[in-house]
Amino acid sequence: MTDINRMKNKIKAWLWLGFALVWLAIFSGLFAISMGWIGYLPPIEQLQNPIDKYASQLIAADGEIIGSFAHSGTNRVFVEYKDISPNLIKALVATEDIRFESHSGIDFRGLARAVVKTGILQQKSGGGGSTITQQLAKMLYSPPSSNFFTRMMKKPVEWVIAAKLERYYTKEEIISMYLNQFDFLYNAVGIKSAAYTYFGKTPDALSVEEAAVLVGMCKNPSVYNPVLRRNSPLPLERRNTVFQQMVKAGYLTEAEADSLSRLPITTSFHKMDHKQGTAPYFREHLRKIMMADKPERGDYASWQYDR
């Protein structure tokens, strides 16, 4: 064996050793996080029963919803998986997490691709590597941060939370939770509010092109917003990218995607707030009653309550 071959073998051995040490450090860190030794990990009870803030709905005697009241400017209304259009589910999985059905919260293949393409090759189209479950974990338990180092430190915690969520929930429940949590702007938090706000529809009635618009917004609800950016080509380009992802996943043919890509984005915008809907004066009166402090006897004369 020549000196050159010996040197090559040594380099290979050191590279494999370094590779093994990196993975050992990653798995050791994940184990430490899962045991609660590093970082904050929500208790099991909170993972099994996430705290959700939904709008309070005002329902008439015949069961008709005549309005809603939302806290902090949101208008989230829960919708079950069975009431979500298959077009929306297919578009979401194809675009955000193509291996959603096969992974357990962390897509190591997608993560490796993102590291190589984005981190090493500096390609903008490398993808983020985050699964739908990881994104849900971030929405539920990881407040947004503008600090890059802080975001990177939170990633391993999000991985562990995602793996635990996969243990406690079915894939259908995770899809439903994700779509119920996402903020589509204009007080449209959750897919039910978003479907009505942007298209005047219920989630189960969304067409392929409408579903693609909403899924496209999941990357950035401001940049790819068809109302906020109505004069920008970005929402249309993003929608068409979703079509191409659906082709790769086998949900659309090239001909179908090409035909859909020629369509303009047509919205039916309805910004939702508590003033819209049936009987606004009655609902406002009811809201004031519900928000009022509990009466105290000391605030009234005896003749006012002793009857």
What residue spans do the PLM features occupy?
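N-terminal type II signal-anchor transmembrane helix
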Residues: 2-59, 119
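Short, glycine-/polar-rich solvent-exposed loops and beta-turns at beta-strand/coil boundaries
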Residues: 50, 71-72, 104-109, 152-155, ...
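N-terminal periplasmic "start-of-domain" segments of outer-membrane beta-barrel proteins
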Residues: 64-76, 111-118, 154-155, 300-303
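Non-catalytic, structured segments within soluble enzyme domains
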Residues: 124-307
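Solvent-exposed coil/turn segments that connect beta secondary-structure elements
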Residues: 61-64, 71-72, 84-87, 95-98, ...
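Terminal hydrophobic membrane-targeting helix
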Residues: 37-87
